[in-house]
Amino acid sequence: MSGIQRHRHGHAGAPPHRHPPQPDLEDAPYTDCMAMTDAVAGLLIKKKVFTAGELRRMVEIIDSKSPAAGGKLVARAWVDKAFKKRLLKNVNAAAAEFDIDAGPIPIRCVENTAKIHNVIVCTLCSCYPRLLIGLPPDWYKSRAYRSRTIREPRAVLREFGTEIADGVEVRVHDSTADLRYMVLPMRPKGSERLNEKALAKLVTRDSMIGVTRLEDR
């Protein structure tokens, strides 16, 4: 699918390889949303709601987040049924039990089962629980993913290598500015002897978006 890139290797010690040409950020059009964001930020700084330094520090905090926080919540839900119920009821409150700040926007957790597979999209822009699973990947923000996932989710999932059987219901959840989603993936078979810390390391960003399943061990 246009906009979805598969890149499975690291760069340290990797053999020479080519990347598709990417436009410089300066070459991208300055959109209305960008202009509005800059205008609002400038106005709030001018009115001393916050300083430019405070804004920069908050952006740095958000940019530093990784899927590890979400992985901790998933792992605890796998081993603690009571916590799982709390997570499915209120993600933000459940995250606070780990001293994890999930932000002010409500987040809803949807559970994958043998009969239901959930996948997350934001059809308007790139709304996403960044404080729990890190920055959204480029493909999540792409027009192709945003438009096609609603119309043909099975085809999109197949392009990620995720085959969903005909008897399994696929539910697509559209994140908005007022409500975000994260997926509770199924626990991999063969992980029964792993402790909670080891389980958390199995959880991936893409599994919490719902485009992939965790591989059995």
Which residues are covered by each model-predicted region?
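Terminal, compositionally biased segments used for targeting/anchoring and flexible tails
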Residues: 2-217
